[in-house]
Swiss-Prot record:
This is Translation initiation factor IF-2. The lineage of its organism: Bacteria, Bacillati, Cyanobacteriota, Cyanophyceae, Synechococcales. Residues 139-154, 295-311, 352-362, 380-393, 440-461 have a biased composition (Polar residues). It comes from Prochlorococcus marinus (strain MIT 9515). Residues 802-804 are annotated as: G5. Its main location: cytoplasm. PANTHER family: TR-TYPE G DOMAIN-CONTAINING PROTEIN, TRANSLATION INITIATION FACTOR IF-2-RELATED.
Amino acid sequence: MTISDKIRVYELSRDLKLENKDILDAAQKLSISVKSHSSSMSLEDAKKIKNLIRNGNSGKKIISVSKSSFKAANEQQNNIDNQNKDSNSRSKPLNKEKPSKESLNKKPLLNKPVNKEENSLISSNKKNTAKLKNPNPPSRISNLQSQVLPNSHNKTQHTIKTKNPNEKKNSTKIVQEKKSLNNNSPLRTKSPARPPIQLIEKPKNLTTSNKDIKANKKNDNSLNQRPQQANRLNNNNNFPKKNINNPRIKNTPELVGAPIRREDPKINSNRQNSNSRQPPSNIQASPNRPVIPNRQVTPNRPSNPNRQGVSNRPGGGQNRQGVPNRPGSPYRPGNPNRQGMSNRPGVGGQNRQGAPNRQGSPYRQGDPNRQGGNYRQGDLNRSGSKFNNQNPSGIRKPVAPNELMQLQKTNASDKEKLNRSNFEKQKVEPPKQKAKAPNSRLNASPTAKKTPHRSFTNNSKKPGRSDWDDSAKLEALRNKNPQKQRQKVHIIGENDDSLTSETSGYSGEKVSILSASLARPKKEKSEEPKSQKTTRQFKKKNKETTRQRQKRRAMELRAAKDAKQVRPEMIIVPEDNLTVQELADKLSLESSEIIKSLFFKGITATVTQSLDLATIETVAEEFGVPVLQDDVEEAAKKTVDMIETDDIESLIKRPPVITVMGHVDHGKTSLLDSIRESRVASGEAGGITQHIGAYQVEFEHESKKKKLTFLDTPGHEAFTAMRARGTKVTDVAVLVVAADDGCRPQTLEAISHARAAKVPIVVAINKIDKEGASPDRVKQELSEKDLIAEDWGGDVVMVPVSAIKKQNIDKLLEMILLVSEVEDLQANPERLAKGTVIEAHLDKAKGPVATLLVQNGTLKAGDVLAAGSVLGKIRAMVDEHGNRIKEAGPSCPVEALGFSEVPTAGDEFEVYPDEKTARGIVGERATDARATKLAQQMASRRVSLSSLSTQANDGELKELNLILKADVQGSVEAILGSLEQLPKNEVQVRVLLSAPGEITETDIDLAAASGSVIIGFNTSLASGAKRAADSNNVDIREYEVIYKLLEDIQSAMEGLLEPDLVEESLGQAEVRATFAVGKGAIAGCYIQSGKLQRNCSLRVLRSDKVIFEGNLDSLKRSKDDVKEVNTGFECGVGCDKFSTWNEGDIIEAFKFVTKKRTLNK
């Protein structure tokens, strides 16, 4: 159907009763852009095509059924003719027409003017034609000419109209040749019998081929697309004579099945530029069509005598012999008798490189269907190929089957139409399968064998088979595994010697012409190999063999081992625990070394097990690496960080917060005491600092009183807690180093703390009054840690002091003030308070108590604040003097009461305007804090639990299971902290549940199942809990004082210990006489001290040496058995296992008693 003013190609072909290819070729001649049978064109373009075809046909029919049947009859006769012609052609010499080197190396355009040599060949062909007497010559050459020359004849009728200059130059010669050929051949010869070995009888064949060509005009797209081949046919008309005389021609490899490439736009453009196209009139297949000008044809090609159906293949055909005008192409006699070539315009002809008459090429054998053993099986008698668009004679295209079929792959509708038209024309040959290359030819020689790699063509069946009329079978054959068929054909095409050197030449250009009207197959062809190649590469890239994997692993292990040979100077432990693998990485050791070290210390561990800080320090010291606790590498939330944009207008200077750090033996505490005592003499009380860990002093500097806030960090407890929370409250760090000891591991730790807080460091070199003090040595050691003194050109202030003699204390304070002034410390006292919790504890009378350091704003009594996950409302505040105050400004330490729980040291606190807002924030923080704490507790217990399991296997482990319930979370944490301080060498305390609140029935059930004791601290029992405890025999202990609770728990732990057996002396006796009784003996003794008891243990001493130790089995006094004998009495002593008594032996009587063990032992 037409679309507005347009018409489809297949509609036009149906109207004109032509093939789609004919219409597409005509459109290409007229430069009308159409791509496939479904492309549309304007009605004007359609009229042009109609006029072109009608003018070319000159009123003749395109195809008739009678010609198809006539063609089939000719094909049967040609089989016999081919065999005879082959035998004649073998006896003819082939070397007469060997092209010159110059002409072989020179590869002209396909439409090349006929040279002299070709003219001579044409004239010789004419002579041969004149000799023919029989109108039906059996020769293959005549058959080839009959299928090619009429087309050429028809085209020469229009050479006067052509725009190609080459055609005009050669038109005279071609017209003459046409006349000679037509005069020698009748118009239509239907004679079924032909003389057997008449090789040069062209006239009959010419006439027949003219009719055949007219019948196959629909299929003659290749002729129109490749006018160059017609020129070759024309120029090669004189070749048959020499070919017949050349015996090698028969076996010359003919490039009949050359693999055709997909159409390349560059090749196509070159083809259009280089090929001198025929005018539109050349499209029509006239029965009297002469050889196309400039198309050199080898009419007498003895190497392919039996190839029928060549008339429709202008590029191939009878005249494909030596190809004299193909420069550089030797004789390739391996494909001599390939039939069905003339209908392939892009391959046949004398100018085709790698053509059958390549001189010097050996015979290619091994293809069964090549006559004489030298013919390519897949190319000999391929007939009726729908791609070749030939008449029913069974002519086969000369290109490689896989290439051409993929190029000419059409959709289903095209295939049906082409198959239908071919079937109507031939009646005997079914349409060819789309993806299968023709495997056998109908007219193959009797001795030809079928190549197993070739797929069957439509003529592989006998003509007239009724089963080929079934369209379903045809469709099934067309769609049957085309990829495999293409692969098979492609392999044969690659092995074809006639294609290897010339596949990139004119054959490629001809392919582009053949596929000009079929864009879809080209797409499939180009995409399939690419996708396969990509997939193959992807799989190959991602696949790693076992050998490669082992090699890569070995290289990685070697590199890791090389990297671990350098030991670090120190290691930093994050959050006080590391796994074995992490510790090995930090120490640059193998994990097996760490496990071995732990094993020798009695600890069984795996690479994923966590180690506590003490264990890490022990292992690291063994390898000579000091251990430092990790600093949280995040910005310190100092006062300036707590200042908001609204505070800028109200900022004032605030006192600095100074933290004193250093090794415990370097006088840190003494220096703090010295500063406090000097201020006490001035009337400033500082006793409160013993409780809150922070205090504030005044110092006169430049006639002004300056306040300094000192943060006491004994044992690094408060400071470590703050670092763990990522909070830094220090403005200036004072590093105390002993002049007689130098830098110690804790000194390095203090430096690390200060650097993590990003605060300035002031070094106090203490103990300068002692003998052996060397401040310069301390400066040298500190310079190695990048702390360079000012007098050495650095920026670190170092002050030599003596805490005992109070030397340079004022100078130290002055330097601290100078450094703090450089820091420009400011705060806004008019806003709500923000700060940090320095210390927190649970007081018996006051409840949870926290020491707060206000960093910004003013803290007032009654404020609602949130400290971490703890909510509080300030009920009272106490300053460093112990006085109650109502408010505290920036940098002021206070002791605050009123928290719901004991807050965590190091948490930040912030005052909120109302309690509701504070509660919402506290609830979110509490959830996160509990999850974090649980993870830390589980991590810290891994090693101890592992070692405990080993002890339990040995029967040495005792456990006390507890369930702890308290009034508030602060009490729970305080009790848990105290329990951690108890000795755990032999008895472990396992707290299965710890939570604030009352004791419930659920707690009773858990205790009954686990055998635990319930500890209640300042809490009560829920209803029903007491009854459940009595029924389950669960022990509940309630306490109000933490000390009593800890004493009872310690006593319970000691009760789990095995008691000690202690030897207790009873008395001593001396042996004064012996009496033999039966087999034994009795010793008469005198009790010197103490007493003897029956069944007690005794020890016999002789000359101060123990000769026997056992039990006292018999004790008598005057023949009476008694239980004991006291001092001053005589008695008889008998032992079952000892009878060698001597006078003077000493008997020591004793017994073993149990003694309760304590946890301290």
